[in-house]
Regions:
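A short beta-sheet element
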Residues: 1-39, 53, 183-190, 194-248, ...
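DNA target-recognition patches
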Residues: 14, 22, 142, 147-179, ...
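Intrinsic, low-complexity N-terminal interaction/targeting segments
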Residues: 44-61, 66-70, 257-262, 267-270
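Periplasmic-binding protein-like
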Residues: 44-46, 248-253
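Short coil/turn segments at secondary-structure boundaries
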Residues: 49-51, 151-159, 254-256
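Amphipathic alpha-helical segments with low aromatic content
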Residues: 67, 73-134, 282-285
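Non-catalytic DNA-recognition/assembly elements of restriction-modification systems
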Residues: 125-149
């Protein structure tokens, strides 16, 4: 419900009329502690309950003034608490920058270590590998999994997060989206893959992820589940990395029904998905 920002200096700034500006009562609370406490889940829940409006909900200045907060009477304790969380925020920022750098490095390496623009040779290769990559159909190396959870072998509902992979639905959404009866869902085993046809920011053609975190789980039949036909010929980790690239996007774009998107869900059949091209090196290079 909105956000809280603390002015970092004594310069003057211009704010929109939808922004509430306020100062502290210095003998009751420190600026840093107030900035910290206003970002807590408890205060967020209070503000959410007081919010009004349609799509863009907001909290009035009058409502904001009624929010109760708990504060230590000792000003030194307030400063120490604020200092701890400020330090944590700083560490989060540093790690986020490292993550961003590594993410960009991975993206650049994926671009250069997989063939592109019809070539059978990637721009960067490991020493000792010079052979052309082989063009195959995805369906040549994987097979569809349509195993149902008929005997209720698993009660763990999964969802596909483009960022985190196949994860527990309850943990991810903080809620159970799947129906209580999951006997008609697909039963997915560790090491198998699933294609989520839903588009999202950064994933315009959905996402393909492998089940790594759990031994088994269940997925809605809206997803396309598949496994590798021959593990001795196709490396599972290679396929995982391949689907982190955009090399398969063109194949999906060519086969998805033109303009057919139902609330962000691509209209592509399993047969068409398995018909997309994939380029493979030797098993050793994979």
């Amino acid at each position: 419900m909105g956000n809280v920002a603390q002015i970092p200096d004594n310069r003057r700034y211009i704010l929109s009329q939808r922004t509430i500006a306020f100062d502290v009562t210095p003998d009751l609370i420190t600026e840093n502690f107030l900035a910290t406490v206003l970002r807590t889940p408890t205060v967020f829940a209070s503000l959410t309950a007081l919010s009004s409006g349609g799509t863009a909900k907001g909290v009035s200045q009058k409502s904001l003034a009624t929010v109760d907060i708990a504060i230590p009477a000792n000003m030194n304790e307030q400063e120490q608490l604020a200092s701890i969380f400020s330090g944590i925020d700083h560490l989060i920022t540093l790690h986020q920058r490292k993550y961003d750098k590594l993410f960009n490095l991975k993206k650049a390496m994926l671009e250069k270590m997989f063939p592109q623009n019809g070539s059978l040779y990637p721009e960067i290769r490991f020493k000792g590998f010079t052979d052309a990559w082989e063009q195959r159909k995805l369906g040549d190396i994987v097979e569809r999994v349509v195993r149902k959870n008929t005997n209720n072998e698993s009660s763990l509902p999964l969802t596909i997060s483009a960022q985190y992979g196949l994860v527990d639905q309850i943990t991810y959404f903080n809620n159970r989206v799947a129906s209580r009866d999951v006997s008609n869902y697909y039963l997915v085993l560790n090491g198998e893959f699933a294609y989520n046809k839903s588009t999202s920011d950064g994933f315009p053609f959905g996402a393909v992820k492998r089940l790594d975190l759990y031994e088994k789980g269940v997925l809605s039949t809206l997803y396309i589940v598949f496994s590798i036909r021959n593990q001795s010929k196709t490396d599972s980790d290679f396929l995982t990395v391949f689907f982190d690239t955009d090399r398969w996007h063109k194949g999906v774009a060519e086969r998805a029904a033109e303009g057919a998107r139902n609330h962000g869900l691509l209209n592509i059949s399993a047969d068409d998905f398995f018909d997309i091209d994939i380029f493979l090196p030797s098993h050793r290079e994979e």
